[in-house]
Amino acid sequence: MSDAVQSVTVGRRSIPISHPGKQLFTSPAISKLTLARHYARVSEAMLPHVRDRPLALEAFPQGIAGQGFFMKSVPAHFPDWITTTEVPKRGGSLIQVLANDPATLVYLAGQNVVTPHVWLARTIDLRRPDRLIIDLDPSPGVSFADVRAAARDAGERLRAAGLATFAMVTGSRGVHVVSPLRPEAEFATVHRLARALAEAMVSDAPNRLTLEWHRSERGRRIYLDVNRIAYAQHVVAPYGVRARSRAPVAMPIAWEELSDPRLRPDRWTVRTVAGRLESDGDAWARIARHARRLPTLRT
């Protein structure tokens, strides 16, 4: 592929992609231009899930075989048409990117951003999340069948508490179980409920599940991570590409797919996601309609 600048047009903007032939992935070879086109293709499905959420940007200037890094503050060279927000932090504030239009997603890919990560709260109130997420992260040697079973268990418990449940394979190793919330409770309150649910799961299956943060202490168990439910924490965005072989994509799925033995956490890639959306649409298209008030924690 020529190294001359090429453009990707989305809406009214034409985004120049420098070094479009740069291979960001080598197994198989996937270029920066292919990455940019991926985000253009998925933008209609992706934007409702990321709009107005501050982003942490995982970039790989030399491709995923090289050193990656996270960007939280907006670099000075970013164009002024990109929407940003000021995020308060201890001792000051950060200016962070908001992916509120397709052109921003494409521009970020052109800046070697492979994976955007999003807050669980939106700018309307950054201290009150509209998502509760349990991230099921298996240790090496744990079967994905066990991950699927644990995700279904988490869903049953959340529904028993009065919440709706959605699922996403992360494109890496695990599954996110997600309950949409009305943004009324602060992070600490939401975290307490998620933690209590996770503790009950671990109590019922201590040989399969753990809340141990240190990887060396987990053994061959599934880590139930609820610690992303906190101010300034972030999770991989739906339809975000992961920095792994084959360029797998974090894919929202129908809840029933958690019972499919063919399901894998990296089943969909930049080369197959378009077909999935064409045939099945966005599995989270109605997630916002199911947002509910956080239930009272029973003691």
Q: For the regions a protein language model found, what residue spans apply to each?
A:
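Short beta-strand
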Residues: 57-60, 165-171, 212-216
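Flexible loop/turn segments at secondary-structure boundaries
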Residues: 64-67, 77, 142, 174-176, ...
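C-terminal accessory nucleic-acid interaction domains of nucleic acid-metabolism proteins
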Residues: 1-36, 47, 51, 93, ...
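Signature for HUH/AEP ssDNA processing cores
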Residues: 97-170, 181-183, 187-189, 299
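A short beta-strand motif that forms the metal-chelation/ATP-contact edge
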Residues: 176-182, 222-226
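Charge-rich, low-complexity segments
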Residues: 1-99, 103-109
